[in-house]
Each structure stands twice: as C-alpha cells, then as structure tokens.
Amino acid sequence: MSWMLDKEIKRELPKEWRGVIPTEVFLEEAEKIVKEANARDIQLRILGGLGVAFHSQEFRDFARKLGRVGTGAIEGQEYSDIDLMSYRKHRDKVKELFSDMKYAKRRATLSSAASERQIYYHPKGWFYVDVFFDKLVVANHPINFVGRLELDFPTVTVTDILLEKIQMWEAFSIKDLKDCLILLRTHSIEEKIQKETIDANYVAKLLSEDWGFWFTATTNLKKIKKFIFEIEKLGVEVGLDPRQLKNEEVLQITEKIDKLLERVEKEPKSFKWKMRAKVGTKKRWYNPVERPETVGGFGIWETLLEK
C-alpha cells in the first residue's frame, strides 16, 4: 500500500488503545478537519455513520441499546474511516488542506477517478479519509449534494444522511439498519427545510423523479418497519436485545416511517418515473457497486426477512 501514497506513513497507535481507535478520536478529528476547511472557505461536510453520531449525541444511550456503539469492522471499534463531501471547485484547496494537516494522499487510480474522490491517510496511520465531490457516486443510487452542503454544519443534513442509507440495495448492513433506527428515533419528519429534522418534501420530490431510487428507498423503509414490528423475534439476529427498547420508542419509529412513506406516495410522479415504473424490476434499477461485502444480494434483508 505504501507505494500508492505520496509520503510514507507508519501506523502508530497509543498503547492504551489496545489496537482499538476510540469513537471520540474519529468524532474529534472529523470535526477538526471540517472546521479547518470552513476557516479556509471550503465547504466540507461529514457523511455516513459519523454524521449519525454527530446528530444523536444526546441519544448515545439509545445507540448503546441498539448495540450500535462499539461495533465495526474491527471488533470493539465503531468506525474505520471518515467520509466527507465537498464541491468539485474545491478539489485543489482540499488537497492543500490535507497536505497542511500532514495527511498522505493516495495516488489517483482508475477507481478513485471514476468515483470522483480523493483518499487521505492519517499522519500516524490511524485511519483514512474519503473525500467525495459534488455527488456520492459510489452508491446504488448516486446522491447529488450540489447546493446542499450550506444547509448544515459540520455534517450534511439529517435528510441527506438518511438518503445515504436507504439508497442501498446490494449491501444494506446491520450498521445501516441501526443508523436508520437512530435517525428515525431522534428526529422528527417535517415538510420543510429545518435543522435536526428529516425533510419529507425533499425526499418525496427526489424520489418522484427516479423510480429506481423510489423503489429501493421505500422498500428499505418498509423492511425497517417490518423489522421493528418483529423485533422480539429478529432483534437477536442483529445483536439487539428487544427488551432494551420501550414500546413507545418502537411506536415512534413506525409512525415516522408511515409519515414519510405517506408524503412520498402523495408526491406527483414525473413522466420519466411513470415510464420506468412500467418496466419495474424486470430490468436492473440500481447501479452495481463492487466491494468485498457486495455479493449482488439485498444485504441483511435476505437473512432477516422474507422477500
């Protein structure tokens, strides 16, 4: 791997970590990077699971009840990298930012060029940072962030984080399920742009233009609802003790899913959407994303729920 970096990096973890990088380190470093970018007039925002954590700091107990805290690719470690989004116009400035912060840049490959991203490694080899530009292209349904980064800080909006999760068809994971449950438990569904809320209008309008995205997103939401309804039986399968969740928490989540789905269905669909709907699933409706955990299936749903 060293030959792919523009400088040599040696992995040096403090002994007291015992090989596991604390969640707080990821949160602090991500915020540090984004704040430094902001000081340089660079729009740079946190994506994914770390974004969920930033937006649910007051509900870490709920995340622990779900078994989300401390679970990741490395046993006992919650996260393995930092995902960020910026604008294409800032590419050179982003490169300069990470160079000044002593990160090592991974040399461009066909894969990184095609996915419109830059990859940087922590000065002490703790983790890598994935920076995407304008769009999240490495996705079953690419998401456009142009004009969206100014709406929140230090992360993308809660709405966009939820869309990141429910756009997955091939490899929807246990972590993604739990992140969705956290987002839905801790944020209200509103029909307007407002911080710390899920903008049902934006979701509905976006999905009304793309039948494939609509099908994947609504299927995921319905399966999340089915999971939470059958949590007594299915919870153990994902490392979740059903007794940890209160009935009102389950009810809150299901009501929010219903509200979001209702708004999505109410939105008038475009001509393009209607034409694609006639073809349905006879033709592939998502972009395949090749990665180790992707095997062409529907992630955890294949083992948890009946199709």
Outline where the language-model segments fall:
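Internal, well-ordered alpha-helical segments in soluble enzyme and binding-protein domains
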Residues: 90, 127, 176-179
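Short, charged/polar micro-motifs that form catalytic or ligand-binding hotspots
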Residues: 23, 81-85, 166-170
